[in-house]
Amino acid sequence: MDRSPTSRRRRSLLKGAGAAAALGVAGFPAIIRAQSDAIRIGHLTPRTGFLGPLGEYAVMGVNLAVDEINAAGGIMGRKLDLIAEDSVNPQTASTKAERLIERDKVVAIIGEISSASGLAIAQVAQRNRTLFFNTGCNSDELRGKSCNRYMFHTEAANSMYVSACGQALLRDGMVKGKKWYSLTADYAFGHDLLKVAKRFMTANGGEFAADELVATDVADFSPYMLKIRNAKPDLVVSNLAGAQITNF
């Protein structure tokens, strides 16, 4: 479900800062001792495409965290060397994750916003036995059947957000006997979020009047607005992402 622009900006900054800070407490001394002077880590996040605006905030956050850690003397006396890449899409994310590990010899990868790209990176990390800190992917699948021992999460799952928002809506009488109309981003994150939201509605006596999958490159929401007006739902639910939210 959608969150305010201020909240999204704050979360994006915290995601990057939290991820780099996590490296400071994670330890893995055996890996650190095997490296040269600096501790090299990779950061993958979309900086172009419909998630690009969110990615820019993630970049600001991780740069801030790395600068603060290095200014304080680094980790165990060693500075962090950050290598950042634009992940763009799942295929590119997978390719760049492989390159960061094999060519750049990073000890860990942090980042992502796209759940589909996060899954691709997680598979590469598992195959290469490299740590992956997920700082922005919300899909429950990444914490369930697709989770692995090399992946750690600093961001909440879709089910957590649905439960929190849902309890507030239950309190205000906006669930039982009500009809919702959802617009959902047509990729892994959106599909997962819609599934969780439907499960919540079914369990609490509500229903969806309709649910529309929206392509990630859609800029004109006029046709959807007309459908919503005709459906007369009690609540419109935005399961959109990135530039979709602004355009809607």
Residue ranges and their predicted role:
Residues 1-9, 16-26:
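N-terminal secretory signal peptides
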Residues 28-47, 51-54:
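C-terminal segment of N-terminal export signals and the immediately downstream linker at the start
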Residues 47, 88, 184-187:
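Residue-level signal for short, function-critical loop segments
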Residues 50-60, 188-192:
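Glycine- and acidic-residue-enriched helix-capping/strand-helix junction motifs
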Residues 53-58, 74-144, 154, 214-221, ...:
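Beta-alpha junction/loop-to-helix N-cap segments that form part of ligand/metal-binding clefts
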Residues 54-75, 198-200:
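Short, polar/charged alpha-helical segment
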Residues 69-76, 128-130, 147, 201-207:
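Short helix-capping segments at alpha-helix termini
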Residues 140-141, 149-248:
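Extracellular/periplasmic Venus flytrap/periplasmic-binding protein
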